[in-house]
Amino acid sequence: MKKILLVLVICLLLATSCKNEPNPFLVKKNHIGLLTDSTQVKDLDAIFANDSVVRYIAGDEFTGSVNTIEIFDKGGIKLLDLSPVDALDSTSVISTVRIIDDRYKTEQEISTLSTFGDIQNAYKISKIDNLINSVVVSVDKINASFTIDKKELPSSLRFKTGEQIDEVQIPAKAKIKFFMLHW
């Protein structure tokens, strides 16, 4: 009887100790770690309880600007920039997440340390936008856009903003400057 009770206690301990914790650095289409597309601004302090949440209050309601919320880890390293749908509204959801830290990775291991070639191998590219100082590569599968500095492009493409840039024109070794998720 004692052996059965001991086995039962051990099984219960093993079952309760095997929690399946979500990866706080996993990037998917509708969430980043515990942050989801339905997370409200008021919930950020609970989600990032071990980190630092920095909110800037614009103070000028006439500007209509969105207040960026910055997330830093306990060591002071910047992790994320969050933009809510409505500025100064604690019930607003997050619309855009700018991923700064290289620990954040997609299921295909794409991070800020990745290259354009890595993105091409992992995802189907939906669109490429040619901006003044950068190129933005959009991937609809994960609602992400990857920004590449034009310094990574051949010199013939660096100063042309009106022309469409094709996938084949971007070098595979071009580094990602940062990437964003749009919800």
Q: Which residues are covered by each model-predicted region?
A:
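Long, compositionally biased
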Residues: 144-161
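Short acidic-hydrophobic surface loop/beta-edge motif
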Residues: 6, 69-72, 137
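An amphipathic alpha-helical core segment
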Residues: 133-149
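Bacterial Sec-dependent N-terminal signal peptides
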Residues: 1-25
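Short helix/turn-capping signatures at newly exposed starts of structured segments
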Residues: 18-132, 142, 160-183
